[in-house]
Design a protein with these regions (language model features):
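Active-site neighborhoods and metal-handling regions in enzymes and metal-associated proteins
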Residues: 1-117
């Protein structure tokens, strides 16, 4: 598998996450769903401390945490929230690394085109 293919696993997983994120969703569940999606798309492991998805919400998005010390919080996503997902899929020792911040406003994921208009 090529590097660009591993990156596509991460990119497709972020797009998937945008379709499932909703208020009341627990960050632990979101992490699990993202990791399962990457495996479904072809990842065979996760290169960064065996964590496939670092997931943060609200004020947690401003904190930098080492993978060695990372613990997904037992927090739920709010109606108006900010969620950062940082993915680290691996396939055949080739790493992917992709992160995005997703904004929810009035329970809906805000599309970047809406922000620009």
């Amino acid at each position: 598998m090529e590097y660009s293919e591993v990156q596509q696993i991460a990119k497709k997983t972020i797009e998937y996450a945008k379709t499932i994120i909703k208020p009341g969703m627990n960050l632990l569940d979101l992490r699990d769903l993202c990791e399962r999606k990457m495996l479904e798309l072809g990842a065979d492991s996760f290169w960064y401390w065996d964590i496939g998805a670092f997931v943060f919400a609200g004020d947690e998005t401003t904190v930098s945490v080492s993978g060695k010390k990372y613990v997904t919080s037992d927090r739920t996503i709010a109606e108006n929230d900010i969620v950062t997902i940082d993915l680290s899929p691996q396939c055949e020792n080739i790493w992917g690394d992709y992160a995005r911040t997703i904004i929810l406003e009035n329970s809906v994921v805000v599309d970047k085109r809406e922000i620009l208009n």
